[in-house]
Amino acid sequence: MNNLFKFLFVLLAIFCPPISDLVVSHGVPQQHITIIKFTTNFAFRTTFYKTSSSSIVIGEKITLGTLTFGDGSSTSVRASVTSFDTKNDWFFGQFIFTKTYTALTPNNSKQYLAMFTSCCRISTLLNNKDADWNITSSVYLDNKNWPSVNHSPVSGMLPIVQVIANKNNNFRVIASDPNVDDKLSFSFSTVYPMTQPSGMKINSTGHVFFLPTSVGLYSTQIYITDDAVPPAYAVVDFILESITEPGKCDPSCSNGGATCNGNSECKNCANAGSTTSNTCSTTNYPPYFVSPTPQDNQLIPFTVGQPNSITLSCKSDYTTRTVGIQAANVPAGAAIAEGTSSQGTVKNILSWTPVAANVGVYVTSIFCYDSNGLTSSSRSFTIFIAKPECGNGHKDPSTGKCKCDGDKWDPTSNCFDCSTGYYGQNCDPTPPCDKGIPNEGILGDGKCMCINGYSGDKCDVPLSQSCKDLKNSILLSTSVPSFFVNPTKVQLYIESDFALTTSLNIPQKLTKIDVFVLVDVNVASSTLFGVVQSSISTFVTEVSKSICETTQFGIGYFSDASSSGFNFAPGSIIGSNIVNTINGYAVSSYTSTSSGNSLLGATNAASNSNGWNSGSFKAIVVLTDKDHSSNSAAITNFVNTYISNSIAPVVVGFGASSIPNWNSAISTADFGYSTVSAATSIDISAKAVAGLKSVLSNVVYKTDNTTNGASFVKSTPSDVAVSSTADTVKTVSGLVLTKPSATSIVSPVASVSAIGFGQTDFSINYNRPPTPTGTAFSVNQNSFATFKLTGTDPDFNILTFAFTTFLTSDVGVITDSNNKDVSTQKSKYYDSTETFTFTPAINYLLPISVSFVANDGCLNSTTSATVSITINKVNQLPTCQQKTISPTLNVANKFVLSASDFEDATPFIQFTSPTDLTAYGTLTFGGVAVTSTSKIPTSSEITFTQTVNPTNAIDVPVSFQAVDSVGAISTSTCTLTVKLVHTNIKPVSSSTSPISVIPRGSVSLTLVSTDSDSTSAKFTIKSVNKGAKGDFYTCSTNDCTCNSTQTNIYTSISTTTTYTSISYTNKVANKLICFTNGEPSAISNYASISFTSTDNQGLESDSVNVVVNIVGNRTNVAPVVTKIQGYSVYQDYLDSDAHVVTGTDADIDDYNPPNVNNLIAIITTPPSNGILVTLQNGSIAATQGKAPFTHYYRPNPGFKGTDSYSYQVVDTFKAGSSIESTTVTVNPINHKPSVVVSSYSFTSQSGDGETQDLVTSDPDGDSVICSVVSIPSQIGMYDSDGNLIESVPTVLSGTSYSFKLLDPSKITPTPFTSVSSSFAVKCTDVTTKTIPFGTLSTGVVTANVQYTYINTPPTTQGGTVQLDQDTVKVFTFNGSDIETPKDDIKVKILSLPINGQLLINATGVALTTTNIASETYNLNALSYKPNAGLSNWNTIDQQSPLDSISYTVIDQQGLTSDSDIVYFSVRPRNPPVYTGARVIDVLQNTRYPLTITSRIGGGGSEVNIQVIGFTNNGTLSIAHNMGSEGTMDSEITSYPNQQSGSTSYNYAYMPPRNKYGNDFDFIYFKLFDGDLYSELYTVTVNVIHVNQPPTIELVSYKILDGVSSEVLFENTSLINMNINTTVLIKYSGNDIDVDQVTPLISMIPNFPLRGSLYAYNPTASNSSGAPITRNSSNVEQNADGFYYVVFVPSKKTSGESYARITFIMTDNGGLNSPIVGVLINVNTVNIAPFVIIGNKNYTTQTNLTASVMGVQFDDPDSTTNNVSIVVSIVGQKDDKVASLKDIKLSFTQSPMCEYHQTLASITCIGPKKPLNSSIVSISVIASTAGDYRLKLFVDDLGYNAPSAIRAQSHLNATGYVDVKVNAPEATTQTTNNKTVLTGAIAGAAAGTALIAAAAWKLLRKAAPPTDTFFSEAAFLGDGVNANPLYEQSASAAENPLYQSASDNTD
């Protein structure tokens, strides 16, 4: 078994760290009691895994088997090599695995049994050889006591511990416990049955005492447990190597000093003849450990993060020897620096700088060895690494927290785990990871886990590309150098026809050929089958000689018997000795009929797992004597099966004239070989060898049509001839793959087979059309939105997209990134990165959709997808229209301002600063003055009355806004432009009236026109009443000095007279006219004249009438004007004091009426910078009037300084006074500043609000300071510095301010709504003026602020949902919206998954396209269910997400998010798949090698098997292939039974003897991968009836002597009969076959040499019928169903083993039973002995000797042989032997006799003559009177019977002599002596058995060694009646010769 798996040592320890001990990587679930760390240590033979013991390296990973966890899950064990020993050929490995068990319910506990088990132990073990090993440990989970965790013990031993044979050895098993207070206890393991070494003991402290009695290997397993409750345990399993202690040859020997194991190995020694000297001395001391090597069981603490070292030192007392140290179970990461041996000493240094992850207990074992092969005892010590407070750091005393050693350690984990960006035990920097997530953390491996669409170590290789960029390419190929055909596996992409070359590498000398022979076991005769058996032997020999000597063979059978045939049954797998297999095959029947199933058998054989070797040429040789009769479908299946398995068929029809059907099938296949042969072993073998050579000579390529990608194979290579003289190394062309024109196969797989030589499997990728992904989004009314087109491609090609439908302009427009309308580029394809902008038509609200297709560079998608657009209705802000009006001064001007709103038919108008207009007049609506808060319905009349006439035309802008019904204000401000023009004020005409003129006198009068806005005037005379003698005239001299006679200068005035171009000076134009009259006396109202004045702009004043009175006739005195003293007024203020122009007139008394002041005051020069008005608040200019003429001075606006005006008084005679002037000083005052505050509106989408400015002004140029005196509600107002204004008043540092909305979710009463509010500002100037007042303010100015909340669309982010295959996963869409509670957000599905379903959680109903078109769902309302059996494994790269959907989320207001995608990553959960047969046909009484074949499930990693149950009619075993030692079956005795670590598992099924039938047994099993279990598979076992040979049973025999009874044979086949007798032999024949309906034929195959046989005739006198001879050997069945023969020995002959008679049965199938025989002893007759008694009665007295004479015996047929006699004194009833206390007897001579010690009995053995001499005189003396009998018992010991029955053939005889003993007469008493004697005899009863025993011992002593005797057990009873010495022969009553002697014998 050198090539077999050698298990040396396994230790399984469970380390259950508390939560603080665990170091977890990023993403690992939180630590818990259910997280268990397993540490397993293994030692195995290095050369089982490696080519040499030195080819292994530290750190190498080696797969060893499977560790099961007790919960149905397991993991593959890949141990990391930690140490090795090249000399002893072992390595030590460690495997650490962290297992998470199912969470426990509160206050609960659970126990699991972890196990590492397999077969087989090394076969050279002295105990437990070839047995399974079972290494276990218990896991106890208890969350009641968490985090107090009981850790299992930890131990370590050398894999092989050497001990000295036949000496006491003592060593210690070392173990430690992480729970340092736990006490450990050691014992032999009883966890699993095993045999511990004999002579080995272990105490509870771990001390082992071992005295091995043999040299060799022992295995042991030690159980180590702690004292916790419940306890935790571990086992350590290791090997003890018992060796002979080596010695040294004596120096006197020729090889003195050499190592020896015994004296014989020391040659030519001088002291060889000495009887006391030992030429091989064992005083040879091994090396030993010296200080500072740690002591056994020493605990050595190591510190995390610091270098630690241990010195190991070994010494030998022999300085010339080289010594070394071997260590085992060295912790991973620790290193041993080996020193150089010098002077018999060596030092090694074990060094280790442990990291935090190494916290724990480590037991390391060491031993010394020297160059002479001596080893020290092993020593073990414990390294204990305590958990530091700060793993890879230290505690900072200033903070009390952990400070890590560098940035790579994470302080939040107390420096036990890596920081982000680091991985592994040393927290190395993670490699670059471009498009992925690095596997970080202390348990991470640093690998980059790519996101979908990327690959490569750095995840920087995009998987996507354009189809047009792809060419035919091989993505991956696998070549196996040892295979004939390469590559074996190819993954490729096909765009068009692709020619692929393969290679052949067939050596001239083939070394790998597998041949499976399929034998037809239904042949015409046993002779022909014998030929077939011989041909197999010849075939194997010839193939090995002429083709390949390393060919491996297997064999199987089929039977074409018409009634009981079968298609296929395996015999033995490839690599077996098929010659032995076929020679051991028992044929059930021989028939010449055939069912023609040979082709079906060949198909089944090719489908079976026959143990083919990888890389071998595979052939099946079919040997059949009949042609097949299968139909075309079966032939097609045959061809496909051989192609798919790459097997070459060779068919030999032996003994058949032709096999045309087989020839046709091989021709159809176009490969293989068929021929016929003669029915001889030589020809059959020759034809089979020729066929094998034929299929080996040519490589035929065929496509496997059973694969789903067979249509992709366009052509296969042509046949290739295999060279017989050289290696066939060739590149083969002709294999062309193509893409079928129309295919939808997902992941096609094709296979091309080089028949027999191997095959190439193709995983094919090809371009498939992409799928566009619909999207949906929403856009706000009159806004815009951007979107992209998306899609998926199964081949990850880069996609472009094209629209297939387009929008019309009345709906909206879609533009690309270049702002081009896509509808104008209808054939354009856009990249996936293109961003489109959709702008809906103004106020368009209906849903919109457009369609598009995806293109992968080669193909358009077969369907289009839709972009669905929802336009969200948003409250549109109203708009207003500009307006211009041109009012008329002092005229009510009515106008209408226009505004519009999408929602409101009648929005409102609101002026933002109406004071801008009211400075020029009044602004009213409905009779009420308009303010900034007035809301005026649109289309309503507004009235403006201009009251201020500007000097020049000006445009007054007045801002206003539109406001809708919800208070939303238009974003833009409109302007009402009021065009104010200067209104020409008509002049005011005036003149003094009446005027007086003296009779015949003249008087002047002045036509006055006052006008403030004209430059010249025209006076028009409207009427003239001259009076009778009067005239109105003018003089060209501008005075009244001319008269009518002076016509040249005198002009009379008439109604047509006008005076033009009279300039205004100081707003006054004057025209002097004159009146003259000729009346002599005064006349009142004498004349009159009326006139108007017209300014140069055409306005005419009212008409003024001047009346002329003719008065008096006297001399007038001019009046005197009163001077007004200078005064002062305040700027911009009307003088509050009245001033009067008046005067005095000297001749006032001349007036009529007298004393009336008729003076006229005239303002001759008005003020230049102000006006004089007649009323304090009036507007009528004061020009003249009756004196006293009151007036007020009003300075012009803004004027300050001095002004003056002049004045005079005129009397009624127009006599004017002098003109006086008065100076007015206008003192400056402080003016009120002004501020313009605009209303403001902003939205939630316009940011936080723009900065606004106050427009301030001050007429005096003073600085203006503004304060906010009221703030808006729910809208934050910020000052010039950006600080929130929280209290009022607040002074602004500048004139700017801004607004921000406070938290929109806190708007009341409804969050996320619009807010209308107002704020107020008050500004003051900065002045030094105090009179008449100081600082002035603008007053409170209020403005509106409008915040319009525009609903924000929700947001979402796609993701990946992880779930397992064939499960349903409830998931939640990612969706958020600031306005909408999460529970109210809905999701709209845009596309359904392709490979699964979306289900409604509440109902389980699957969504359809109809559902998703109209319905929305809660974010958590759906679940995903993949289609059955589908997972990521079914994608092109077998790892991409299986499915995806596109979706969008919708808020409460109907706004939708951008669409996104949810991917469904379905973890493959494909259990392993059983690929073998579900029904097996097993031949009756035949072992069936059952191989459970399987394949790893898609995405899986391993295949394990668990046999669940078995119906147990037959026997199911695990078949262990022991290589050259054959196969060993170990019966499965309990279920479930589990195996791991392969994809095929070998079992053996054996039906019970002679049982058969369909559905005979059922084998139930599951395959599993980790915790993933397959369906329950059932293999149905049909046990096929095979004709069984009949059997013979010997029943009985009877001696035909008339008296003998029938004797059953029972357990013997021996007949004892006497000489000259006849025996009748009875036997039966049986056949279990139900088809055996006729009686079996019985024959006598071998006749006895002596005696005669006869048929049985019960009617004959001697029962003998016809003689049975060699020519007539049949024995007919009797009517009772039995067979009888009569045997008659030859007369007068006898002897042991006299004759042997054999019988055989033959069934109707021609099968013979095993031969059964009887052995007959013909014995001579043993003659019974007899007793001769002379005197039968004697009388004597007590204490007197009586001599009994004449007692003799004879045995007629005894001469010199021994006989036995017993002479005893018994009672009258012969029931008890008398005691020696009562009576004694003796012989005159007794050399052959033995006296009983307590009873009156003598036993003698010897020939009869000396015995008779001994009893010639028998002395009897009694001390007790009574009636006695002397008894002689004779036994001939059966010596004349055959020795075999001697013990049963004893004959005997008995004789009696009555002896009456009387008491002396003098002492005679009346008491009955018989009674006394009876009591004496009764007292002696206990001794009877002793007498018999003594007799037996004597007999045995005298018996010859070869004699057979009864055993001592015969004498163990209480009485003698059961003793054969005391019984008559059973034959004595049947034959007079055997009659025993009686009392009357003479």
Curated annotation (Swiss-Prot):
One GO cellular component, as annotated: membrane
Leader peptide range in chain numbering: 1-22
Membrane topology, from the record: Single-pass type I membrane protein
Transmembrane spans: 1876-1896
Lyase among keywords: no
Chief place of localization: membrane
GO biological process, one term: cell adhesion
EGF-like domain location: 423-460
UniProt keyword annotation of Membrane present: yes
Keywords: Cell adhesion, Disulfide bond, EGF-like domain, Glycoprotein, Membrane, Signal, Transmembrane, Transmembrane helix
Cytoplasmic topological segments: 1897-1946
VWFA domain location: 514-699
Residue ranges annotated as Extracellular topological domain: 23-1875
Carbohydrate-modified residues: 107, 134, 203, 705, 860, 1043, 1113, 1177, 1374, 1401, 1513, 1611, 1620, 1662, 1671, 1737, 1743, 1762, 1812, 1852, 1873
Disulphide bridges, residue numbers: C433-C448, C450-C459
Record Pfam families: Ig_SibA, Ig_SIBA-E_2nd, Ig_SIBA-E_3rd, SIBA-E_N, vWA_SIBA-E
Subcellular compartments: Membrane
Gene3D superfamilies reported for this sequence: von Willebrand factor, type A domain
Subunit structure: Interacts with talA/talin.
Stated role: Implicated in cellular adhesion.
Family: Belongs to the SIB family.
Alphabetized PANTHER family for the sequence: INTEGRIN BETA-LIKE PROTEIN E (PTHR24038:SF11), STABILIN (PTHR24038)
The protein, known as: Integrin beta-like protein E
Gene of this entry: sibE
